[in-house]
Amino acid sequence: MAKIWEKHKGYLPALKYVNLTTRTCFRSIRIEGAERIPQDGAVILAPNHCAALMDPLLTLVLFGGKPVVFGSRSDIFANPKVAKVLRWLRILPIARECNGLSEVARNFDTFKEIIDCLDNEVPFCLYAEGTHNPEREMLPVKKGIFRIAKMAQDQLGVPVRIVPIGVNYEDFFRGQGRIGIRVGEPMEIGEEFAKRAGLAEADIYRELCTELRDRDMALIGPERTRRHDRKFLRALAALLSLPLFAVCAVGSLLIWLPYEIIMRGMEDKAWSHTVRFAMHFIFPVLWIFHIPFERLLNFYRHLFEDLK
């Protein structure tokens, strides 16, 4: 079996299209502090996790055309065909205790692959909360990310750095919002353990989890504010734009109608950006209609909220 970090046929061309499609789902994607990501050595990325598969897609945008390997919960690998596609996408399965001891035991094979990635200077991205949470308040960070980093450092004998990343969604569920991605200063695992020499291992991991969560929360930042003035001019613009909105609604019917049907059948609305991405991925010729359709929809929604 080919190593997951190795170049494989079709990946880079597909990655360019994937990154372009991701950008079409948002009004803007602003990246700050990308220069803080080490360009060599063993690097583990630690973003907050808000929006299912959209979060890894935004990480790919952050890295441009460079390869990144991801960790994800093992239950989505149950179907062999899906597992094959996920591996092609450079995603590794990581089992949790709730999956049972037999599944957790398989993590050792995954850990070997992660360490192999780090040894070959391919970044590994792990969402340390363990699951997504469509809120600005993060869930508690799990210690697994630090265990992996410590294991890699012990086996490779090189510094392993964990990079905090904060992803700020203007809207967790609606399209064409603004995205802010901020990268923090790396945490070198050896230095972090040295600072806490004398503490029990459990206390070290507890402090590290708290610190990573605090760093990510600081990077996420506050909720983006918007203007509420010029109501008359905005109302006039809304009225004049209605013919364009109607054309765009009809033109993008094959995107927004399946999207609405799919999302109504899903309990977990955090998948909304992922489903929207899938529709854009399948129907690129309809971007010209769907992008202005969603932007106008947001414009009308904000206007109605301000006029109440």
Task: Locate the predicted segments by residue.
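Compositionally biased, charge-rich terminal segments
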Residues: 1-9, 55, 222-239
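Soluble catalytic domains of membrane acyltransferases
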Residues: 4-199, 257-308
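Phosphate/oxyanion-binding loops and surfaces in catalytic or ligand/nucleic-acid-binding neighborhoods
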Residues: 92, 186-190, 215, 219-222, ...
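Long, charge-rich alpha-helical interaction segments
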Residues: 196-231
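Long, hydrophobic, amphipathic alpha-helical segments used as structural scaffolds
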Residues: 220-223, 251, 258
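Transmembrane alpha-helical segments and their cytosolic interface motifs
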Residues: 232-254
